[in-house]
Amino acid sequence: MYAVVDVKDKQFKVQEGDTLYVPYHSDATAGQELTLDRVLLVSDGDGDVTLGTPTVEDATATARVLEHVKGDKVIVFKKKRRKRYRVKRGHRQQYTQIEIESLNANGPASSDDEEAAETSDAEPDEDPEAEPAEA
């Protein structure tokens, strides 16, 4: 099973257990669990693909923050010839490393849904073969 998720306007193809670098989340700390609810596409691996418009309803991905890291240095060099103008600057972009723990095509399971399923599976009090009472 794989999914395409949108994290801060960047799209990533993810599977359970994947580790990836996403744009920096300033409010997330190492070890914190994130719920990625902007799932654009879900595939179960058997060729069955669900495409969202723009997102797939009730589909989520759960991820754990591993650490905050900086990317490779990008050198910005400006120069104007014959004018003795040269500026050299460097920049390191910040990223958040996350690990995908689970993909849920039907959204997160809640206790209310489980209770409703248990109630619907319970046998009815009345005998279905009994004849209805006449009024």
Curated annotation (Swiss-Prot):
Protein task: This protein binds to 23S rRNA in the presence of protein L20.
InterPro entries on file: bL21-like, bL21-like_sf, Ribosomal_bL21, Ribosomal_bL21_CS
SUPFAM superfamilies cross-referenced by the UniProt entry: L21p-like
Subunit structure comment from the entry: Part of the 50S ribosomal subunit. Contacts protein L20.
Chain segments carrying region Disordered: 85-135
Name of this chain's protein: Large ribosomal subunit protein bL21
Biased composition (Polar residues): 93-107
Gene Ontology annotations for the cellular component aspect, listed alphabetically: cytoplasm; ribonucleoprotein complex; ribosome
GO biological process: translation
Organism, scientific name: Salinibacter ruber (strain DSM 13855 / M31)
Family: Belongs to the bacterial ribosomal protein bL21 family.
Keywords carried by this UniProt record: Ribonucleoprotein, Ribosomal protein, RNA-binding, rRNA-binding
Superkingdom of the source species: Bacteria
Coiled-coil residues: none
Pfam families per UniProt: Ribosomal_L21p
A molecular function GO annotation: structural constituent of ribosome
Acidic residues composition-biased segments: 111-135
